[in-house]
Amino acid sequence: VFDMSIQTNPDLRRSVIYELYVRSHTPQGTFRAVEPDLPRIRALGTDILWLMPIHPIGQENRKGSMGCPYANRDYRTVNPEYGTLEDFLHLVDAIHDNGMKCIIDVVYNHTSPDSTLVHRHPEYFYRRPDGKRGNKVGDWTDVVDLDYDVPGLWDYQIESLCYWAQYVDGFRCDVASTVPVAFWKKARQAVERVRPGAIWLGESVHLDHILAFRRQGFYAATDNELYDAFDVLYPYDIWPLYEGATGGALPLSRYFSALNFQELSFPTWYNKLSCLENHDQRRAAERFPNRDSLLAWTALCYFQKGTTLLYAGQEISAVHTPSLFEREPIDWTAGEDLSPLLRRLYDIKKRLPTDAVFHVDADDAQGIAVAFYQDGQHLAVGVFPLAGRPGTVSVPLADGSYENALTGEAVTVQNGRLTVSASVIIL
């Protein structure tokens, strides 16, 4: 019997994923050019390297001069811009040799309009009321949607996944909410026979996206439904609250109440991706221009329950998000190097009791969050001055002296309260 409570690996909650766009990672923009950087990426504290789409990009209705990697032409070959299949497999071997797992992006909601499937299997595509191929999201002009009411499409896609699973350790599934959960479950079971323990990260979508789809009569799955097939899901269900709280439009407590609600409303094995940025969102260093605030949010991103995501460049406080449609190599000399902090946070993350109940309290007036894990045996507490200011807050600890796991410094709890400077405390 397929049972996600058994199937999923709880250690993923203590893992870190590094998202890498081959085109922008180096001036060369190739698979081979990534390899020399792998030891550094591993040393940051990376368990899993996620390669954004590696497949050929369509020419028709292409965005920009080079095209978007999420408008792919062929699910079973690699983008010649990046190199050959041999180059890709060499990179995957190098990732494994550096002690990391490798997952690749799969974009199964849509293809480019000139996909290799258009002529071979025209029946695989969604048709608009006028009978023409199209998509359900108006501004995605460089793609056409697939139709999962066609059984043959399921077989083709699962065969593709099983082919890549010979080499990679799992998949990040684009717009996973709009592809049937029943398909993902069947795909997971098939891949498990090829790659036992494969990792499944799903891009679950914003709630308003689900609502818009359903109002039009289209399929869209909730996060609760997707947890029947995925190990890790995106935090987009509460992303607008994160943006509101970090932008000053909402109190911190509004965001953290939603985070606490997740803890008690999702299946016990749930795992939410903990991230401050990704390729579709603003850079954290641009969102948090106050350095102490950036460091506090970064520490919380590692401390909170769920797999942590780093987007390449985040470790050097990059403020510019590389274009998806052009070659914009990351300037690795531009910002402050956070690598030593990230490594310390990674080491702490590995020790967190992530099976315990997780909860966050916020002091809105001071801009401080107190997060903790607690069960009958474990207690781990983090104090995060998210506004970058000192303050004094209540903590669920007995009075006494404790060591800050992040700095090694002694801190004192007195009358159930702890005074924090602008720096994070983890006990």
Show where each model-derived region lies.
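Structural preference for beta-strand elements that scaffold enzyme active sites
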Residues: 15-19, 48, 101-103, 170-172, ...
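Conserved, mostly hydrophobic/aromatic
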Residues: 20, 41, 51, 75, ...
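Active-site-proximal helices and loops of the catalytic beta/alpha 8
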Residues: 174-267, 272, 300, 319-353, ...
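Aromatic/acidic polysaccharide-binding cleft in carbohydrate-active enzymes
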Residues: 270-336
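Carbohydrate-binding surface patches
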Residues: 362-397
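C-terminal beta-strand-rich structural cap/linker in extracellular carbohydrate-active enzymes
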Residues: 413-427
